[in-house]
């Protein structure tokens, strides 16, 4: 019996490995200098009509037929070797021994770390806990179909809640150590409101009502001249998935206006809970802050001109200040080119806005990245500074002192 050999991949397009270098061959055809790669399986199948194949070669002499078959065998062998090389290369890059490998979606092209609240939550948590980690943007979902997920010492964990529990057990970190039993209960209740209710209203605004803007932010590498088409297809597939899952959840059965009313109630609840505190549960960070920030950041920076953006930057300004404090403290490479304000000037046009791409560190550690800079001797008071000259958005502003000072005026 004669056999045929081929390459089968579970995805029809290549994926961007970002800084994870790999053999680049699709880039040669697409004219791109970025590294691309794909992974799949070598499959073998029986040739039922080998005689027909030989007859299909026509009246070529036997030596040509032999050359054709030999060439096919060499191509199959080359495909197999390439596959094995890619697998070995991938395993070398993803060595999770004593290292946290964070799998998440590719960075969007608007300067925001992620369009996924849960990916942003997880990466922010790792920075808050000062845990070095390695990003991997392969696009592969976990065994449960979840994103993000991590690998640590060859163990794979998905679901942000289970990931955090896993890291607390393995590495002894605990952002909630300053919370009492009552505060822990409140924190969990707020987490469920944000992740199981507020999230769906954001998803509706992001992937249904504001789909065209989201499509512009989506980053798809490897599409070459078909990037726009692929982006359109991915966004509309995601839109259908979100609408179907929202309907199953129940919130998708309401009208658009009712969904936005529910969103506003959640945002007002968060604003009321935060008040004038530095963080949601008080002066100290907790896991809840990573959760809330991951979701509110979508309203702040990924939904331009929408109702949640107007609300958070207008009436609920304490939420905007809260987001800015966390962004500046834990994301020094995010929007570092326009730190003076969170608002666009009235004179700026849509075409004049530029976004700095996110810089990704091989192994990120906050202690190696953040260094306190010496304070300047003089300062000028602006509407965005407190009585000490600090920006109201800075992470080290003492909100209690600021409030007391304002009340004494």
From Swiss-Prot:
Keyword Membrane in record: yes
Places the protein is found: Membrane
Keywords: Membrane, Transmembrane, Transmembrane helix
Family: Belongs to the FAX family.
Membrane topology: Single-pass membrane protein
Main location per the UniProt record: membrane
Name this polypeptide is given: Failed axon connections homolog
Disulfide bonds: none
Sequence segments annotated as region (Disordered): 372-409
Function, as annotated: May play a role in axonal development.
Primary gene name: Faxc
GO cellular component, one term: cytoplasm
The species this protein was found in: Rattus norvegicus (Rat)
Lineage: Eukaryota, Metazoa, Chordata, Craniata, Vertebrata
Short name of any one Pfam family annotated for the protein: FAXC_N
Spans through the membrane: 68-88
